[in-house]
Amino acid sequence: ARGYYEEFGKPMLEQEFPELLPFIATGFVGSGSERFGFDDAISRDHDFEPGFCIFLPGEDVVDRKTAFRLERAYAKLPREYMGFTRSMISPVGGSRNGVIRTAEFFQRAVGQPDGNLTVQQWLEIPDYALAEAVTEKYLRMPMVSSPPFVKDSWTCPRTLC
């Protein structure tokens, strides 16, 4: 992820979307054994591929049209890197890489877009979902931090933390 981002993603963002740099983060998070560092030269699984995530804030900061332009630019990045091929990005989802709204990512992962959960909600989140939400390798953090990029912005009920 880091090599692919440094070679292709970072230049694309800096050249085509410099105005977004203060607001977006890039990283390698979510589901999949490679997110946890388990895929290596011997044990790569069926969906091992080069790529990274571009996290966007809400539409009040990055509108739909700009997000769409960013999705198209990501889709145009090279399909092969170091002998590995990227999966096709479907407009209806399916890829774990690409442009993702932070609120949508955390809604899928833990059930709340902002991380404000009751004690009961925290206890009901499956372990794998929590792991996917917090096991991150951020390649670039936004200059203007907003939840959920700042870990302590998540409200963990005092009875649990």
Can you say where each PLM-predicted feature lies in the sequence?
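N-terminal regions immediately upstream of nucleotidyltransferase
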Residues: 1-11
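Active-site nucleotide-donor binding segment shared across nucleotidyl transfer reactions
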Residues: 12-53, 59
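Short coil/turn segments at secondary-structure boundaries
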Residues: 57-65
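Conserved NTP/Mg2+-binding pocket subregion across the NTase superfamily
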Residues: 64, 68-161
